[in-house]
Amino acid sequence: MRRLTLKFLPIIIMYFFIIPTLLAQTGPGQYTEEAPLGSWNIFGPDTAAGLGSGFCRLARASSAEVIYFNPALLTKLPPLTLSLSSSFNQTQLFSYWLVNTGVISTRGNLTARTWQLDHLGLSWRAGSWTIGLGMALTENYGRPGLEYRYVYNQVVYNQMQIRQVGHLSGYAIGLAGKLNQRLSLGASLIYERGYLERSLDEFWTQEEIQLLDYRYQKVKGFRAVAGLSYEISGRLSLGLSLSPPYIRKVKGESSLTYLTPLTEIETRSQASDRVKRPLVLGLGGKLVINQHLDAYLDVLYFGWKRYRFSYFGEDQFRNFRDTVRIGAGLEYRTRFRFLGRTWASPYYLGLAVDPQPDLEVRSTYYFLTFGSGLKNELLSLSFSTALGLESGSGHALKRHKLSISLDFHPDLKKNSGKIK
């Protein structure tokens, strides 16, 4: 048995030193180690009203989640607002980590499915000031789990399992005030906290050799957001948002274990890394076409050229470009009386273009979004769907999202019973 162990040592050495080189040559495209699931261009949580109208949010005051991208809109919410949003996400991937990068091949795209609580928050108005609090799941680092087996003559010779999970949460506090009847300013501070966990387990059954590679990282950081809302006229309003570059700090630990019936070798390491996040600028507009129909347009700029990332003490090169995400949408409302109350039923329709920053694989997602809802002066229930198709990678990746949002406005007297 010792002879067999020595025989496989060169293979083990090749596995851990040559494989990273192969990965660097083939590349995972959009899904590098730290890439969020779905898109790099994330700027706060998506709720149903914004999602359904082409991801347009910068000039739309729909719920308390505005503190994540334009806190000035807090002044446009009812005096007391409680917001809850959840979503189901279905995202296709082709290449990531060891999958379709020269080590493990699949016949087609793999799918990651998640159901998550996107946002929970509240806003409260006191005089000319409005304060907002919120917690949100802003990024998901999960990947489809995969198990590989090499079988010959109904005998398993080799098997491998890979797994990656993780997420990033944002805990926000925001303050906004009206300078006059047309102009509002706001600012938010968001504390980000999350983790990323990756594991590889490979086993040669005949020789009873096992390799375990485990990595765990804690992510922390503070992000600031400043916002402006300005009503040019009774029909046209603008929203402006700014989030300056900032640093995420990452604490990581890893263990590499080699097991045989006669040998156990374990190597542990720790690292402190820094991730430089980019500048984000946003401009949004709202046009009231008539009493039933509103139009929205959002443009978001992400300065990915200056993005920097280190992984367990080593700087990783990211060949990124700056990106501009554009969304446009409509909201049409009908009104009716029921049970002594006035109700509104909004219908959403939108389009969005979401280019990814990687220069080697110029990938872009194109979205069709739609949704509906029901609301009165007390509550608002909305649900929307985004259907996305990717172009540029050669794999026609699909991304679907279903969002459900509930907003509760218990302060009826101050709200004057009006539905916006």
Name the predicted role of every residue range:
Residues 9-21:
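Bacterial N-terminal signal peptides
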Residues 48, 61-69, 74-146:
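Outer-membrane beta-barrel translocator/receptor signature
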Residues 14, 90-97, 331-337, 410:
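Short regulatory "switch" loops immediately downstream of catalytic or recognition motifs
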Residues 1-7:
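Positively charged n-region of N-terminal signal peptides that target proteins for export
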Residues 25-51, 79, 116-420:
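Outer-membrane beta-barrel porins/channels
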